[in-house]
Amino acid sequence: MREIVHLQAGQCGNQIGAKFWEVISDEHGIDPTGTYHGDSDLQLERINVYYNEATGGKYVPRAVLVDLEPGTMDSVRSGPFGQIFRPDNFVFGQSGAGNNWAKGHYTEGAELVDSVLDVVRKEAESCDCLQGFQLTHSLGGGTGSGMGTLLISKIREEYPDRLTTPTYGDLNHLVSATMSGVTTCLRFPGQLNADLRKLAVNMVPFPRLHFFMPGFAPLTSRALTVPELTQQMFDAKHGRYLTVAAVFRTAVCDIPPRGLKMSATFIGNSTAIQELFKRISEQFTAMFRR
């Protein structure tokens, strides 16, 4: 089985991650105690991608939860699916990063990163055939940005042949729904893009053109046809699409997304990503001049 180890760092990353586990646990028929209550064999066929089967038929997420202060960890534990995680996989400090990138990357985060890597190593050792990691974190603040980038660099050093993919996000539910759609091919049986390596081969025409953009439709729960969903997902006004992987669910899929009768998710390799890099560069230049 091709497993994925999930990491979530900082307040934003943990809130998105908690919502993500709620969504995919619901899709796989896993209740908050880790017990399977589904009604389809498809839900269990590739469940080991994100879950480890423990004693007593319990399913435990392959998740590592990280923060530099205990507050977020407490809120995750007290959440609806807080008891499903392995207690040893909560790694947190006491001081916090104070929205300071340098603290998360060089001081407090650097002191905690070895403990995080030990937990990541244990999760990786329990996998039969690890295909990669996914990390949810914010691009601002201290822990998510500072320690998030530190974790990515450390993972690249220790697992150089794995694909590291930071995710995107503002709205937790939208991000978790998009992540659920993107990982559908990995979690359920299919012929196309069944693991991260195949996805990378299909989506990256040239090594340096490896920046993906996600899309999701519909944003409101209403009846749509497949052509209407496709039209909502794509924006042909900005940039040119080099490669696209689209996942349509419910009309042609036995397991629909939660709360929607039909949805579509895509990952696109588009030249429109250059506008994001330009905007970040301009904002950095403006702040640096001050």
UniProtKB/Swiss-Prot annotation:
One BP term from GO: microtubule-based process
Cofactor(s), by name: Mg(2+)
Binding-site list for GTP: 11, 69, 138, 142-144, 172
InterPro entries found in the cross-reference section: Beta-tubulin_BS, Beta_tubulin, Tub_FtsZ_C, Tubulin, Tubulin/FtsZ_2-layer-sand-dom, Tubulin/FtsZ_GTPase_sf, Tubulin_CS, Tubulin_FtsZ_GTPase
UniProt motif (MREI motif) ranges: 1-4
Residues reported in the UniProt entry to bind Mg(2+): 69
SMART domains named among the record's database cross-references: Tubulin, Tubulin_C
Post-translational modification: Some glutamate residues at the C-terminus are polyglycylated, resulting in polyglycine chains on the gamma-carboxyl group. Glycylation is mainly limited to tubulin incorporated into axonemes (cilia and flagella) whereas glutamylation is prevalent in neuronal cells, centrioles, axonemes, and the mitotic spindle. Both modifications can coexist on the same protein on adjacent residues, and lowering polyglycylation levels increases polyglutamylation, and reciprocally. Cilia and flagella glycylation is required for their stability and maintenance. Flagella glycylation controls sperm motility.
Record-stated family: Belongs to the tubulin family.
Domain notes: The highly acidic C-terminal region may bind cations such as calcium. The MREI motif is common among all beta-tubulin isoforms and may be critical for tubulin autoregulation.
Subunit structure: Dimer of alpha and beta chains. A typical microtubule is a hollow water-filled tube with an outer diameter of 25 nm and an inner diameter of 15 nM. Alpha-beta heterodimers associate head-to-tail to form protofilaments running lengthwise along the microtubule wall with the beta-tubulin subunit facing the microtubule plus end conferring a structural polarity. Microtubules usually have 13 protofilaments but different protofilament numbers can be found in some organisms and specialized cells. Component of sperm flagellar doublet microtubules.
Name the UniProt record assigns to this protein: Tubulin beta-4B chain
Gene: TUBB4B
